[in-house]
Amino acid sequence: WNVAISARRENTLKEISESNENIKSFPLDVTDKTKCKEVFEQIKNHYGNVDICFFSTGTWNPKKEKDIDVEQIENVFKVNFFGTVNSIKAVEEYFKNKNSGIITIVSSIAGYRGLPNSTGYGPSKSALNNLAESLYFDFGRHNVRVCLVSPGFIKTQMTDKNDFKMPFLKTSEFAADKIYDGLINKNS
């Protein structure tokens, strides 16, 4: 496989891409619609063909205030939901014209059930669930598979911020293996 990766943290991207010659990094802030399109064009130009896009956008800032923080919720939606929408919009025409491919959207179990101090995160992931279900039909007419992945608690920098019990906490490697198996075996 040849893999293109994108994220805001360029130093992390560089570290990952230097560890494997089949991985190339393309820095990107998914909140920038224009940049999403530009980066996808760069990826297409570099590889010539794209078969799978895997969108795992996310930010999580637990809030313990007793009042709702509207600005914080808007920021979480800007990254988690609209960042994914921007990314999918950037690839939409390509996949529909190609009449094949897989678009994978990473949500969370938090999209199905609220979590403590999570007035932005859970609702943003719930919105992704609904988006994926809608796109399943819209892209399906073009033979493009839309998959929704809703993992439980995965040990990451984001979950390190949690101060509540996280049952069945798994490593990112474990999650990646399960997600890969599900996509390859069409269990999504």
Predicted regions and their residues:
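Substrate-binding pocket helix/loop in short-chain dehydrogenase/reductase
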Residues: 64-65, 69-77
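Rossmann-fold cofactor-recognition segment
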Residues: 19-34
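Active-site helix of classical SDR
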Residues: 88, 124
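Residue(s) in the substrate-gating loop at a strand-loop-helix junction
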Residues: 108
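C-terminal helical subdomain
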Residues: 148, 164-188
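Active-site loop immediately N-terminal to the catalytic Tyr-X3-Lys motif
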Residues: 66, 115-119
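Conserved glycine-rich Rossmann-like NAD(P)H-binding loop of the short-chain dehydrogenase/reductase
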Residues: 1-13
